[in-house]
């Protein structure tokens, strides 16, 4: 068996948790998290794709390479792939695949003063295989919850069987991302990231993996107190102003105007200035 030295990879995933709002760690902890597609290349070979959503399996030798610190893994925003594969491989929360053998092409681009996005880097470097622009629509369609309608049979998620043509384009998109990442590496190979920068990157990853301890009882009580305070203050404001919704900027500005106070805004700074001038 030929020993794998490098692995370029990209995945497409599904989770009911909003990635942009919550980050990758809660994202992979969702019960419905799954890897849909996995495109990869070993040692610069032609990109292959595994359609996990349709039952295909990742070869054991590739799974071993993902965990093997002797195999250098490349991905754009590599922490996403690393954490997703940690969940996929059954690592417990708080324990993740070591970042030591991962190289992030986004970090490489940042070091070179290039755009951080894959499409931005591809455009600046004039790559032959640019990121496919329809990717956002495909990700929105397959990778997140959808609104139930009569037209879609009231489903809350789109599966490959719901639009086979789109699914095939999604697979092409996944493959193209790996091809683009590989071209980025070839373009930047003469400008390597110093080892001390990779050391800092790995340290940053370990810090993120470790997280911080949070007293959740305290957090929950603080949220409860905040809700109680808001309710109490809203009641007091309604009593004083006799407005239906004192939270409404327009209603509050109208009430202030009726009471001799004119203001164009109720931003924090403006309110502080008003309070210093008047007494209500």
For the regions a protein language model found, what residue spans apply to each?
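Conserved "right-hand" nucleotidyltransferase catalytic core of DNA-directed polymerases
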Residues: 1-13, 17-19, 37-39, 137-278
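Sterically constrained small-residue positions within well-ordered secondary structures
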Residues: 2, 29-31, 96
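A short alpha/beta connector and helix-capping loop motif
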Residues: 19-36
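Short secondary-structure boundary/capping segments
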Residues: 21-26, 89-92, 262
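Short secondary-structure capping/turn segments at boundaries of alpha-helices and beta-strands
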Residues: 23-27, 61-62, 267
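Active-site-proximal helix-loop-helix substrate-binding element of RNase H-like nuclease domains
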Residues: 33-35, 40, 44-61, 65-189
């Amino acid at each position: 068996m030929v020993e794998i030295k490098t692995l370029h990879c990209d995945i497409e995933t599904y989770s009911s948790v909003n990635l942009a709002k919550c980050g990758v760690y809660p994202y992979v902890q969702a019960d419905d998290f799954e890897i849909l597609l996995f495109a990869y290349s070993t040692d610069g070979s032609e990109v292959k794709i595994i359609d996990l959503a349709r039952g295909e399996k990742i070869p054991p030798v590739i799974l071993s390479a993902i965990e093997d610190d002797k195999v250098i893994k490349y991905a754009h925003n590599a922490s996403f792939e690393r954490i997703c594969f940690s969940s996929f491989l059954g690592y417990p929360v708080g324990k993740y695949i070591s970042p030591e053998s991962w190289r992030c092409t986004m970090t490489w681009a940042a070091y070179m003063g290039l755009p951080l996005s894959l499409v931005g880097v591809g455009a600046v470097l004039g790559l032959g295989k640019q990121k496919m622009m329809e990717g956002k629509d495909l990700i929105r369609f397959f990778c997140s919850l959808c609104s139930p309608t009569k037209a879609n049979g009231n489903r809350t998620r789109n599966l490959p069987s719901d639009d086979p043509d789109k699914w095939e384009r999604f697979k092409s998109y996944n493959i193209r991302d790996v091809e683009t990442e590989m071209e980025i590496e070839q373009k930047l190979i003469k400008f390597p990231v110093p080892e001390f920068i990779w050391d800092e990157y790995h340290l940053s990853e370990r810090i993120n993996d470790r997280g911080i301890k949070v007293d959740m009882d305290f957090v929950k009580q603080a949220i409860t107190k905040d809700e109680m305070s808001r309710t109490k203050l809203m009641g007091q404001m309604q009593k004083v102003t006799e407005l239906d919704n004192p939270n409404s900027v327009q209603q509050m500005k109208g009430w202030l105007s009726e009471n001799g106070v004119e203001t164009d805004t109720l931003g924090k700074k403006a309110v502080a200035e008003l309070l210093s001038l008047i007494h209500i």
